[in-house]
């Protein structure tokens, strides 16, 4: 399990972090989002990959059950992500999380991002949840980036309220990435290594993850399948309404 330590709740607006990365902070193109959504909802691909490297890889790490108060927003089960733009382990996790959430809804104002140019696995291509909005009739999602790409930001993000800070402080190990699945399970750290994305840009990754035999598909689709399974886990309403929850890989992962 890989966890990047955070010493304080430093909340940052990342949209201006373009040093060495012209695309960073700019909206993901509609054509790219459409293609990514097609990958996300390719059930044949998802079932073929299953959990992939998220279980068999060197950094295999699964969500752990907790006994929290059920987490909902407007009556919908809620998923919370906490990370930072500089963090390479958050970078690889965002690929899987975006794909998983696209199986239940869609994003607007999702932007391109790269991890820090000075950290390990420098400049890992990814996305940022800053200023993005998630739309779904059956699931709620909110993503917070605590620190910008240069690891020097200090702009307060008002969305990370005391409510979310308390959830993070209670159930996280103090690091990022952190994902809370409806307060039923939480994931501390990444499920796969960012190394699988090394040397590729966004379009190359998108092309590679369509082929179940590639290392990037085994990692990205594998983690997306893990995230999807834990969104569906122990949720009767979702299992009745969401096609993703009825896929064979979900049953294989959560039993």
Where is each model-derived feature located?
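Non-globular targeting/processing and membrane-anchoring segments
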Residues: 1-78, 92-94, 99-255
